[in-house]
């Protein structure tokens, strides 16, 4: 790939820090394995995001009673991604699944069902709901819609992501996202890492025939999994170049990452 390709006109300056304010740095000897992990998590985020999109569409199509429902939670199963819509009991000691959206013949096709009476939520769903509530409460109020996602982390911990949602079908936001690492029971925040600060909404002008996008990481020297999510979601599908302190990276349209300049 050549950086001389036509690039998106606007550069995004991205600031990354952890809860302790540390700069994200990866040694060159660990870089290949780290980038493979970013790709894996980014692809999983994309799959989660797609399941949430199509699963919630199916959910709202049956005109549900949303009173008391908490967050949607996507779960990867042998049959594909499923989306649960739980709620707490009045005493907040049991989590019940009131609705569920399941795959129906393809990744974009879901069928929603209502459980009457609601089903008891398994322990892993309870932990994920607690983790979401903890992260959302810490994140606070945003001035635009946000999506959430939950992925497995090392040592049984949970990654909870909050990232800006699309508000227009042809505009893709990048930035303003946070990743929390939360204990396996969903009760303790172990790390809060802001992946990007600035939010920019990218809209492509077909007259420009843009071949790739570009943004710069100022306080991080590696791509983030939400960068991969951005590339996999954006239409038209084009690569994204990321300028960091020591390297220039290319995120390809399949989510893989390569170093294009050292």
Positions of PLM-derived features:
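Positively charged n-region of N-terminal signal peptides that target proteins for export
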Residues: 1-5
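Bacterial N-terminal signal peptides
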Residues: 6-16
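Sec/Tat signal peptide C-region and signal peptidase I cleavage site
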Residues: 17-21
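Active-site-proximal loop/helix of nucleotide/amide-processing enzymes and allied scaffolds
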Residues: 22-112, 117-119, 125-156, 199-262
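A generic structural motif
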Residues: 86-88, 165, 183
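A short, surface-exposed beta-strand/turn
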Residues: 95-111, 172-190
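Hydrophobic, aromatic-enriched interface-forming segments
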Residues: 140-181
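A short, well-structured beta->alpha microelement
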Residues: 189-203
């Amino acid at each position: 790939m050549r950086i001389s390709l036509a690039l998106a006109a606007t550069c995004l300056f991205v600031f990354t820090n952890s809860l302790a304010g540390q700069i994200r740095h990866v040694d060159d000897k660990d870089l290949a394995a780290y980038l493979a992990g970013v790709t894996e998590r980014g692809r999983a985020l994309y799959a989660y995001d797609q399941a949430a999109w199509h699963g919630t569409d199916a959910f709202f199509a049956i005109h549900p009673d949303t009173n008391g429902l908490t967050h949607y939670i996507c779960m990867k199963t042998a049959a594909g991604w499923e989306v649960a819509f739980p709620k707490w009991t009045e005493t907040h000691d049991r989590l019940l699944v009131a609705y569920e959206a399941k795959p129906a013949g393809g990744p974009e096709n879901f069928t929603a069902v209502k459980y009457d009476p609601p089903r008891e939520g398994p322990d892993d769903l309870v932990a994920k709901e607690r983790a979401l509530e903890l992260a959302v409460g810490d994140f606070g109020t945003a001035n635009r819609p946000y999506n959430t996602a939950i992925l497995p982390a090392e040592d049984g911990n949970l990654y909870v992501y909050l990232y800006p949602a699309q508000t227009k079908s042809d505009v893709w936001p990048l930035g303003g996202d946070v990743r929390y690492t939360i204990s396996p029971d969903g009760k303790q925040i172990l790390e809060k890492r802001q992946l990007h600060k600035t939010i920019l909404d990218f809209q492509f002008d077909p007259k420009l025939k843009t071949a790739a996008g570009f943004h710069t990481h100022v306080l991080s020297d590696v791509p983030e999994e939400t960068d991969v999510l951005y590339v996999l979601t954006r239409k038209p599908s084009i690569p994204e170049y990321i300028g960091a302190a020591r390297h220039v990276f290319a995120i390809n349209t399949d989510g893989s990452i390569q170093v294009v300049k050292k």
